[in-house]
Amino acid sequence: MKSKKKVFLTGSEGFVGSHLLEYLVGLNYKVKALVQYNSFDNMGWLNTIDKKTLKSIEIVKGDIRDKEFLEKNITDCNIIIHLAALIGIPYSYEAARSYIDVNIIGTLNLLEIARKKKISKFIHTSTSEVYGTAQYIPMDENHPKVPQSPYAASKSAADQLAMSYYYSYNLPVTIIRPFNIFGPRQSMRAVIPTIINQAILNKDKIYLGTTNSKRDYTFVLDAVNAFEKCINNKDAIGKTINIGNNFEVSIAEIVKFTSSISEQKIKIISDKKRIRPKKSEVMRLRSSNGLSGKLLKWKPTYKGKSGFKKA
C-alpha cells in the first residue's frame, strides 16, 4: 500500500540521495526525485538503481536555484528532504560564491516554498564540518560552531536559515547533521573510496593528504534510516540532530585496517594537493548519539569498523 505522504527529495541522484530514495520506496513512500539538470541527461546514481524502483518514482530535472521550477514541482508534495549541495571542500577555496548560490540561496528557495505551501515536514541536511575541530568529545549539538572552510560556512549559514524559518514561521524543520557518511556509490574523491580502490587495484602506495586527523564515519544505510525516522517524529521538529557512530578513527588507521583486509602492505605518500590550508584542517570529529537515541530511537547498525568491512 502506497503512503499518502509524498516526498520531494533534492540531491536524489547523489551518493546519499540515491540510497535514501531506495530506502523510502522500500517503505512505500511516494517520491518525487529532483535531479540536477545537465546537458548530458545524466541522472547520476539513479542510472544504476533497479528498473522497478525507477518506475515507481517521479523524476524531475532542474536546479534548486530556480525558484519558479521549484514552485511548479513541489505543489503535490507534503514533505521536503533537502540533500542537494555543493560538498567538495577543496573546490570551496576556489569558488566560494558558488557555494553561497547553491547551499544558501538554494536552501532559501526551498524554505520559502515550503512556508507558502505549508509543507508538513522540512528535513534539512547539515554537516559535522560546521563544528570545526572538536573542543570536547563526544560532540553534542551544543558544541560551538567554528566553520573552517567556505563549504562549512555555507552549510552553517543554511542551517541557521532553516532554523530561522522554524522560529519565524513555525515551519516544521528538522536538521540532520551527519558525521562523515561513507559506503557504496561514494565519490572517489572521498578518502575511504580512495583508499579502498587503490588497495583493490593492488597498489602498494596510496597518495593522501593529512593522515592524523580523526573522523567519525557513519555507514550510509544507517544514515538513511535516521532520515526516515525524522519524517513522522513530531519531537524532532525544531531540533538539530547529530548522526554518527561515537567512534573515531584516523585516516592512517583506516589505511592500516584496509591493508590487513587486503593482505598487502600499503605505504602512505603525502600529496600536498590533498592537504587543506593549515588553519582550515579539521583535526578531530566524534559525535554524541545522545539526542538521536532519545528522539529518534536511532543507533548505528554498523558500529566501529564493521562498516568498513562491508564497504
Model-identified regions with their sequence ranges:
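Hydrophobic pocket-lining residues that define ligand/cofactor binding sites across diverse proteins
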Residues: A114, Y166, A199, C230-I231
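C-terminal substrate-binding subdomain of Rossmann-fold SDR/epimerase-dehydratase oxidoreductases
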Residues: E22-G26, A33, E58, G62, ...
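Structured loop/turn residues at secondary-structure junctions
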Residues: S12, Y37-N38, P184-S187, T211, ...
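Heptad-repeat alpha-helical coiled-coil signaling segments
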Residues: N109, N180, Q186, S213-R215
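N-terminal Rossmann-like NAD(P)+-binding domain of SDR-like oxidoreductases, especially those catalyzing
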Residues: M1-I181
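Short, surface-exposed alpha-helical segments at coil->helix boundaries
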Residues: M43-L46, D159, P193, A252, ...
